[in-house]
């Protein structure tokens, strides 16, 4: 019900709400609505992207996630802001880095070609200080390995090392998945 197309303009007005929680919810909703109705949220994309630089980590997290969902549906809508998203790969907040990976996975699902020269960014996240980020980082290699195995092949040695030696079981499992995807 909340994702209905006719609710998009109202949800867009909530981007400038009085509270962080309401603004965060509006960002999340616009991302979900944008996955289903990308053209209808297009007018809000510059406002969403402006939150990538917000001082509040929750709003950066939700903004990058929303751009990822919208970009999965129609990359051209978020293209002007795509490179801006990469600054969040080094964000001080782990949830922001995690959502950067998720957003990238969403976009790469339908538009993988754009990631070729950015793989080192994701390789750095394989050794992130936060376990949740490290657990998710191999997944972008899996997503891209299915679509563009040549992008992932230079990182197979590192992924193999993680799959055999990382302390975190999920990192090991996800690394194996990335390797299999690139070798299929």
Segments and roles (model prediction):
Residues 31-32, 68, 105-106, 142-143, ...:
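Structural signature of alpha-helical solenoid repeat scaffolds
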Residues 1-5:
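Conserved small/polar residues in nucleotide/adenosyl-binding loops
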Residues 20-21, 57-58, 94-95, 131-132, ...:
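Alpha-helix N-cap/helix-start positions at coil->helix boundaries
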Residues 9-16, 20, 46-53, 83-90, ...:
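HEAT/HEAT-like alpha-solenoid repeats
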Residues 35-36, 72-76, 109-113, 146-150, ...:
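Alpha-solenoid helical repeat scaffolds
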Residues 9, 24-27, 61-64, 98-101, ...:
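Alpha-solenoid HEAT/ARM repeat scaffold
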Residues 156-184:
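Eukaryotic acidic, Ser/Thr-rich intrinsically disordered low-complexity regions
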Residues 6, 39-47, 76-84, 113-121, ...:
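Short sequence/structural elements of tandem HEAT/ARM alpha-solenoid repeats
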